[in-house]
Amino acid sequence: MSVDDLPPSSASAVTPLGSSVIPIVNKLQDIFAQLGSQSTIALPQVAVVGSQSSGKSSVLEALVGRDFLPRGNDICTRRPLRLQLVQTKPSSDGGSDEEWGEFLHHDPVRRIYDFSEIRREIEAETNRVSGENKGVSDIPIGLKIFSPNVLDISLVDLPGITKVPVGDQPSDIEARIRTMILTYIKEPSCLILAVSPANTDLANSDALQIAGNADPDGHRTIGVITKLDIMDRGTDARNHLLGKTIPLRLGYVGVVNRSQEDILMNRSIKDALVAEEKFFRSRPVYSGLTDRLGVPQLAKKLNQVLVQHIKALLPSLKSRINNALFATAKEYESYGDITESRGGQGALLLSFITKYCEAYSSTLEGKSKEMSTSELSGGARILYIFQSVFVKSLEEVDPCEDLTADDIRTAIQNATGPRSALFVPDVPFEVLVRRQISRLLDPSLQCARFIFDELVKISHQCMMKELQRFPVLQKRMDEVIGNFLREGLEPSQAMIRDLIEMEMDYINTSHPNFIGGTKAVEQAMQTVKSSRIPHPVARPRDTVEPERTASSGSQIKTRSFLGRQANGIITDQAVPTAADAERPAPAGSTSWSGFSSIFRGSDGQAAAKNNLLNKPFSETTQEVYQNLSTIYLKEPPTILKSSETHSEQESVEIEITKLLLKSYYDIVRKNVEDLVPKAIMHFLVNYTKRELHNVFIEKLYRENLIEELLKEPDELAIKRKRTQETLRILQQANRTLDELPLEAESVERGYKIGSEAKHEELPGTRRSRTETNGNGRLHM
């Protein structure tokens, strides 16, 4: 005999599909209920949604077969009710079967056989949290109903959607209830039982509207049409039940509720089910829809759909529980065990120090287990700073970029003093090269600072997660290594300064890589020749008339009263020497005629000459000085600079100095590029790596500090206890899933979640007879 051949009141007694699957999920719900709002794993369940007074409560009571829910004209369900229906075995002696309820908030859990008491407990628990004046809360109530007359189903009865606030309800009560409902039904693991009354337009159903928001394709929504017996005359719900109005993948089921008069008359649900069957048989319009009509068919459909829904979700459910178990176990491990003995605390502190130092050393050496593959880290960053930042920056510097030709010529002239130099002096070269060497100090010190900053970053990265439970120890370790790194930075910077000063103190021109003077002169001459520097053009006052200078010779030129350049220094006027004044001019010389022309003019030139030749020398000289006025010198300017033009010899000297500077600077630069990283590695990096463990032992591993360092904050103890409880619950849930038999392969494979499922494969919609093949597999 098939299920369809049974009377409606007996349909619930049929052995349900997945009789071991739903109890497992119910057990998981009980397990995760211990976590309360902390539970992040959504279990398969059926959420009942509908507007206020849509008949939700009547449907649930019909599924249970007993009156147990609060009743009234106003909103009755003010907290979510997690309802687990558990089928028990019928009594073997033919006596009355026991039915009872258990509330999960009771500790210890006790059986309640009086369903009126169950109703009162629901009301009391609702008032305890939501208040007595129609307040609403999202904290669920857990209730189990044990009966041989039910199928294994897990439901969540949600508050009805209301429009107008009453009592203490806020003005936005509708929005709050809708938000609460969506938090449940938005989960893909939740089936939606959308309850809509038949005496209202289905297109305006609040239940279908909110279900459509969470399940727009209708893949996990079951429609329930209530109050079919009070529809207007001449109307029926056949098109609704066939899904022609609003299609749903899981279809619709129509039911007849008890009226308010039936409830007041204490009409039993058993009698109501008989009346419901009689109603459908008396309505020819509903013929051929027996698998879509009545509470027994609804119970069977819910059972079948829920079982297959659970089967489809089991793999992902196991995966989520395992992932949560792994993450929670790792978190609990990070909190560590409670160590109260002094010896145990000392060993724990020593283990922290050792682990930290090993992590620090491994990170520097590139042996860390947590090495990044997306970016450079640890010692690789230090090498990058040495090669790609420090060395590259020094190689890009031109030692002569801030030295002009005038700077070099001025240095050469200053080095010669009052004498003219026959060769390029070495003093200006040393002065200039020292100045360029000193420029290497700042980038070298900056390189050491960069490495220090990298070591500080590494020290922070090596802080183990276990240290979070000891904030005092973590802070002290951070302080110790910070001070220790600074202590290593100081000698490394001092060594860098010494290296630069050593290079400045001794200019080794005998270095085998130094260009040398001979080669420098050759290159300088070639450079000057190729540049074709024109000869300097003398200013007008520096020029002597050709006819007066033709026979004077070089001696007359160098002793001319006219303006000249002495040792490259510009002077403003010519000054005669005593020798010039006393020495007679050679025959044919024009010096004196030039000298007299400056002071006496050209008209008296011949007379003055004859007069001088006819007088004795002493008389002539005395007369000359008597006739000449006193000559006053201009004071030299405060700052003297080289002339704007320079000779070919000066160009060669400048070019030689530049070549010598570049050659020796390259030697020093290479020395600095090699020695500065070595100094930093020796005094800072390797020193801290070698001595860090000893420093921690010296600074922290003290008997009078251990207890203070290993003191846990109060909130950490709370976290450890909560995590331990979560771990226990997840382990229990994992063991519960392991108890699940291989029934997943024994149910119909037609039910799928997603767009691949087809309407014609729905269980309980076309074929309801259960057949078993030779392999023991079930087919619907």
From Swiss-Prot:
Region (G2 motif) residue spans: 76-78
Top-level taxon of origin: Eukaryota
Single GO MF annotation: GTPase activity
Binding locations of GTP: 50-57, 157-161, 226-229
Subcellular location: Mitochondrion; Peroxisome
UniProt xrefs under Pfam families: Dynamin_M, Dynamin_N, GED
Region (G4 motif) residue spans: 226-229
The keyword Transmembrane helix belongs to this UniProt entry's keyword annotation: no
Functional summary from the UniProt entry: Involved in the control of mitochondrial and peroxisomal division and morphology.
Protein name from the UniProt record: Dynamin-related protein 3B
